[in-house]
């Protein structure tokens, strides 16, 4: 897309004072007005730093060694004030809590307008407009710190968009949203583009950008390796895999099938593109060989391709009995309604549902941080609220959705070590445990850094390390993969699986990552408006699309594709989907 250049980087290299190694290296980039540019990168590749440069946060707020030029509508950004930046740019950061300042949602959203002296009548009009635009009509009087992570993210989006910036910079804006909520935000962003605004969106998952962005940039270790259209981007499969970027499931499946000899009519990257091509294939109008009369997926194939789930021991680790929780005034929301659940020792469970469905409230009740209005939680045969805080920490570990609430030591190493010393574990055992957990989570090289110098993704991994190092009976993680690229997300879930397998820990994750829930979890519990809607193995849960729609959750892409094609039971991953087609057609 050609036209007026909104932002430009010329030979930009940048390093922070705490690290001599440049985070960005000789970056050259032109962004045109009205363009939707997607920046794809793994955790720690410099994407948030790049966005901060484009927004003027660097060098006006964060200092460092900056070489080269950053131009906003042709003006060197070093010479511009932050106030002038604010007229043209609006930035949504990865952590919504870092952008919330006011008590009430309505005050938060109009705060920027108040600072600019916008008339009260105009503020009221714009407030109503953006509240409706971001599906926040009932949130005006809500308290910001009582919102779920996804709700906070939408409020921050609204507070930035209300000022009508010509350039919108988004750092993983859907990371804490349920799948349908994320899709709604993307559609809202596309509406923004109709007014000729520029959107620059950082993402570590290509799927979120395909079909929406008109240009994609691959950033790796501070350098731009690819800058092209979406179709050309995904065809660079070898390069993407080399730098650890996971291809979209639909594209991965289609590539495998073509390699096996299937004559797909197209190489789709999204579900919408895939359906026509795969319907032709299944109807016998394309493809190779003769369709077999066997079932879509044999028991043998299912066992060979399914995720290897160790399962539980049968001993009860956590029991939730007739649990009700009502938040006190002014919120006064009945967040949990007669919830009954049992978690066996060694179980790996996922709690899913739309933002505000009660997932985090349930997790905090299980951990003993919230006292139920009625009913209770039994951990190790005892009421969790009757256990003293030291024993509770040994029995139930909890990792918050915002990792910064759990980080307070001077270095990454000391942060993890403190947890062990607090429980009386010292000496060589403590040192070995710290090194093992940091190496496994790819944090050992950062052990000397202050936790607040880490990226959001690395902070999340550090918070998990601090709790997992204790090896509690039950480990609850609220959105363990927030801010993680797919490779690191997979590594975190693998670590949790390893902890479960080695020590019999019951693992409970709250997640919007359906692919991870499908591949790692023994059980999936879907909440809807504070009630348990579904509670079954992943394949059974994800096959019930109508009920899942009530929770604003969508199954993994290949599962959706199979269900649309009438394939039952549906596959949970690309390996299973590939096996289905190889069973249905003889080559």
Protein language model features and the residues they cover:
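Helix-to-loop junction immediately C-terminal to a conserved catalytic motif
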Residues: 55, 367
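Conserved ABC transporter NBD signature motif
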Residues: 63-75, 375-383, 392
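Conserved ABC ATPase "signature" region
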Residues: 121-139, 428-446
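Conserved ABC ATPase signature
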Residues: 143-147, 151, 450-454, 458
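Catalytic Walker B motif of ABC-type/P-loop ATPase nucleotide-binding domains
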Residues: 168-171, 475-478
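ABC ATPase nucleotide-binding domains
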Residues: 240-316, 548-587
């Amino acid at each position: 897309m050609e036209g007026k250049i909104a932002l430009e980087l010329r030979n930009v290299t940048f390093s922070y004072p705490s690290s001599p190694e440049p985070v960005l290296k000789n970056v050259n980039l032109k962004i045109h007005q009205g363009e939707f540019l997607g920046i794809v990168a793994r955790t720690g590749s410099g994407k948030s730093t790049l966005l901060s440069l484009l927004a003027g946060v660097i060098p006006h707020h964060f200092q460092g060694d900056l070489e080269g030029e950053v131009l906003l509508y042709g003006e060197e950004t070093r010479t511009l004030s932050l106030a002038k930046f604010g007229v043209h740019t609006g930035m949504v950061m990865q952590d919504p809590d870092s952008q919330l300042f006011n008590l009430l949602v309505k005050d938060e959203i109009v705060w920027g307008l108040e600072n600019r002296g916008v008339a009260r009548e105009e503020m009221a009009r714009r407030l109503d407009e953006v509240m409706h635009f971001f599906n926040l009509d009932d949130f005006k009087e809500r308290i910001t710190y009582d919102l779920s992570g996804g709700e906070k993210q939408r409020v921050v989006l609204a507070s930035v968009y209300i000022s009508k910036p010509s350039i919108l910079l988004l750092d993983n804006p859907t990371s804490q949203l349920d799948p349908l909520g994320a899709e709604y935000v993307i559609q809202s962003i596309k509406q923004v583009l109709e007014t000729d605004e520029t959107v620059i969106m950082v993402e570590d998952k290509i799927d979120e950008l395909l079909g929406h962005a008109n240009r994609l940039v691959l950033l790796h270790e501070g350098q731009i390796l690819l800058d092209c259209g979406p179709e050309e981007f995904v065809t660079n499969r070898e390069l993407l895999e080399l730098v650890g970027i996971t291809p979209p499931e639909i594209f991965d499946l289609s590539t495998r099938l073509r390699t096996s000899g299937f004559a797909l009519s197209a190489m789709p990257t999204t579900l919408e593109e895939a359906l026509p091509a795969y319907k032709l294939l299944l109807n016998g109008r394309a493809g190779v060989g003769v369709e077999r009369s066997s079932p879509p997926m044999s028991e043998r194939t299912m066992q060979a391709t399914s995720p290897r789930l160790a399962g539980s021991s049968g001993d009860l680790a956590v029991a939730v009995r007739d649990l009700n929780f009502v938040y006190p005034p002014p919120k006064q929301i009945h967040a949990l309604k007669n919830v009954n659940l049992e978690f066996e020792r060694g179980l790996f469970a996922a709690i899913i549902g739309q933002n505000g469905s009660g997932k985090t409230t349930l997790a905090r009740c299980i951990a003993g941080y919230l006292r139920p209005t009625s009913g209770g939680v039994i951990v190790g045969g005892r009421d969790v609220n009757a256990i003293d805080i030291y024993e509770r920490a040994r029995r139930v570990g909890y990792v918050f959705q915002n990792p910064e609430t759990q980080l307070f030591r001077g270095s990454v190493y000391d942060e993890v070590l403190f947890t062990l010393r607090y429980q009386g574990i010292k000496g060589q055992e403590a040192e070995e445990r710290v090194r093992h957990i940091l190496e496994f989570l790819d944090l050992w090289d950062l052990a000397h850094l202050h936790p607040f110098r880490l990226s959001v993704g690395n902070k999340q991994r550090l918070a998990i390390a601090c709790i997992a190092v204790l090896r509690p009976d039950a480990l609850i993680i609220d959105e363990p993969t927030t801010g993680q690229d797919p490779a690191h997300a997979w590594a975190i879930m693998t670590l949790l699986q390893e902890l479960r397998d080695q020590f019999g820990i019951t693992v409970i994750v709250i997640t919007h990552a359906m692919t991870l829930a499908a591949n790692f979890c023994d059980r999936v519990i879907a909440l809807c408006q504070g009630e348990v809607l579904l509670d079954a193995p992943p394949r059974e849960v994800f096959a019930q699309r109508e009920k899942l729609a009530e929770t604003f959750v969508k199954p993994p892409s290949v599962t959706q594709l199979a269900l649309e094609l009438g394939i039952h039971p549906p596959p949970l991953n690309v390996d299973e989907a590939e096996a289905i087609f190889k069973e249905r057609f003889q080559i």
